[in-house]
């Protein structure tokens, strides 16, 4: 029997553009079902890693559903698609009164966060309850940054480099932290359950918008051999046709670089640049190693679809169109991925997640 591979899923940050990786995963799920294999994503992937919106997706697929059946995840891919296409409008919305108030006391979104985090927090509590990351149905890594201790934080249910158990966090708070994009939401105050202390965390996208290399390193910490690891990295789209013109940028000053109306250019450049760099590094690193399989799926999106917070119906149509093109352009590769996944599921002998491949969701 072939040795079981370790499939690792990594998803970038990108706000409402998280709809794109959800659609790609739906395509994989549909292809599996067409081949007679029906399993939840936490059985397909041995480790999931996400930043920001990617953290929300991976956590929802890996967390146990409060009050659900054994092995039932907090959300299905269909649930997540509904969130992006319908519920995200509540997260990224403001009442007329609040918009008028902000125009007076917070022009250009420079002196306070753009959105009230309470609707997001209510949704997260409803979806995750008070379960903690220690109860995850598969290995999981979420990125964040501690603004008080000035350090990168990798929230995981795996192992530290010294072999000890990682710090534990409530799922809903961990997701609130990894999605706390500066200028969009306030920093998250979360409880470190292991250390019995609070931490002030913000979106991991400030240092690692594409967490593929972090996902690989976590896999190695777990003792997995490099030749057994397959990394599937999903992007949230790239807008090559949305430049920041020199003639405008030279007059922005410190406040202009953070203007919400311009899509927060500084954060946009940081996130896009880091994702491109991480993808470049991963592709060449894994190619040079010649042992770990690395697969990156991403694509171009229209300039007007780049905003992290544009949940209007017209923009969702653009994002769905971009996802359709990525899926269409990578049909052969997606079929190859599904072939590998099915072969791997059939070679699963003795895994704690093993069981029937049909109607296992």
Locate each region found by the language model.
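Conserved catalytic cores and adjacent C-terminal regulatory segments
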Residues: 1-361
């Amino acid at each position: 029997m072939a040795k079981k591979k370790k499939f690792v899923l990594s998803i970038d940050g990108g706000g409402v553009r998280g709809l794109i990786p959800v659609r790609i995963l739906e395509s994989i799920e549909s292809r599996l079902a067409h081949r007679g294999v029906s399993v939840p994503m936490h059985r397909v992937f041995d480790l999931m890693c996400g930043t920001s919106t990617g953290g929300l997706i991976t956590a929802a697929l890996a967390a146990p559903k409060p009050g659900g059946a054994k092995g039932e995840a907090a959300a299905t891919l269909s649930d997540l698609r509904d969130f992006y296409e319908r519920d995200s409008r509540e997260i990224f919305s403001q009442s007329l009164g609040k918009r008028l108030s902000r125009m007076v006391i917070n022009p250009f979104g420079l002196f306070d966060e753009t959105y009230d985090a309470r609707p997001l927090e209510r949704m997260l509590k409803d979806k995750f309850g008070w379960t903690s990351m220690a109860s995850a149905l598969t290995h999981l890594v979420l990125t964040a940054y501690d603004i008080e201790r000035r350090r990168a934080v990798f929230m995981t249910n795996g192992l530290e480099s010294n072999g000890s158990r990682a710090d534990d966090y409530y799922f809903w708070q961990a997701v609130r932290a990894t999605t706390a994009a500066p200028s969009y939401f306030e920093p998250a105050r979360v409880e470190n359950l292991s250390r019995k202390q609070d931490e002030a965390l913000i979106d991991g996208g400030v240092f690692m918008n594409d967490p593929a290399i972090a996902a690989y390193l976590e896999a190695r910490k777990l003792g997995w051999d490099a030749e057994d690891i397959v990394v599937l990295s999903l992007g949230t789209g790239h807008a090559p046709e949305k430049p920041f013109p020199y003639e405008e940028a030279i007059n922005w000053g410190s406040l202009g670089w953070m203007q919400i109306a311009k899509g927060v250019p500084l954060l946009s450049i940081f996130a896009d640049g880091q994702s491109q760099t991480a993808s470049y590094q991963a592709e060449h690193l894994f190619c040079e190693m010649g042992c770990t399989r690395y697969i990156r799926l991403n694509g171009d999106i229209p300039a007007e679809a780049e905003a992290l917070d544009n949940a209007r119906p017209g923009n969702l149509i653009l994002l769905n169109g971009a996802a359709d093109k990525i899926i269409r352009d990578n049909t052969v590769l997606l079929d190859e991925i599904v072939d590998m996944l099915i072969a791997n599921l059939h070679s699963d002998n003795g895994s704690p997640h093993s069981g029937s491949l049909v109607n296992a969701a």
